[in-house]
Amino acid sequence: MKPQNLIIDCDDTLWENNRFFMDAHVRFVELMAGRGHDRARADSLLLRLEMENVPRYGYGAMSQARSMADVYRLFEPVPDEAVLAGIDAIGRAVFSHPVYMLPGVEETLPLLSERYTMVMFTKGNPDEQLGKIEKSPVKEYFSHVKCVPEKDPDTFRRVLEEFGMAPEETWMIGDSPRSDIMPALANGVKSVYIPFSMTWALEHQELPESEHIITLDAFHRLSEILL
Ligand SMILES: [Mg+2]
């Protein structure tokens, strides 16, 4: 049976996102290597600190930049202000990166919006996320936008409650097993998992076998099952 409501993830589901963070990561490692520091160590330290810092710094470009500054201070306990400014600039560039829609999204969303009530559901820094949403050409197709610090079963349940959406009448669509699919499953909501090659490592998780999870290889294929 088809649902009435669609809750749709934004980053790496509607538009490219993680590649900007990956590019910034590489720029930081090169910056450290250029100062004579070990490239592999800069790379692994940044990965580790980014994961460890999520509870303190949250998600997003400036959180990544703060982790870069932390790594830099491990290499140079007396930091150079110009290097710190350079790291800040890397973060700002990611913060306001251009929004490139993923293939099929702009063609499919208008069709879905004629039939479903749709919610954009995203996590991270509200200013950063809302900036991308404003820049995107698809905001008009959504009835609601919700940005939370973390996507988990509890925040997912609250979104259902806030918008008065019954679990059995709602589907979740996203690229992240951990942040999109598992929270939906925990709330009895069917989901469509659309894997993306550049999804952040921290978002990966083994998915259980479930009749509540449909996997598609491209966004436009939603029209095959929802229209
Ligand atoms: Mg995503």
Where are these regions (language model features)?
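Active-site neighborhood of HAD-like aspartate-dependent phosphohydrolases
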Residues: M1-L45
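Asp-based, Mg2+/Mn2+-dependent phosphohydrolase catalytic module
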Residues: M1-Q4, E106, P110, P126-L227
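An amphipathic alpha-helix signature
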Residues: F21-V29, A65, A69, P126
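Hydrophobic alpha-helical core bundles mediating ligand binding, dimerization, or RNAP-core interactions
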Residues: A24-V29, L46, E50, I87-R92, ...
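Short helix-capping segments at alpha-helix termini
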Residues: G34-D38, E76-P79, P137-E140, G164
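A metal-dependent, Asp-based hydrolase signature
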Residues: L49-A93
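Substrate-recognition element of Asp-dependent hydrolases with the DxDx(T/V) motif
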Residues: A82-Y100, V105-S136, V145-V148
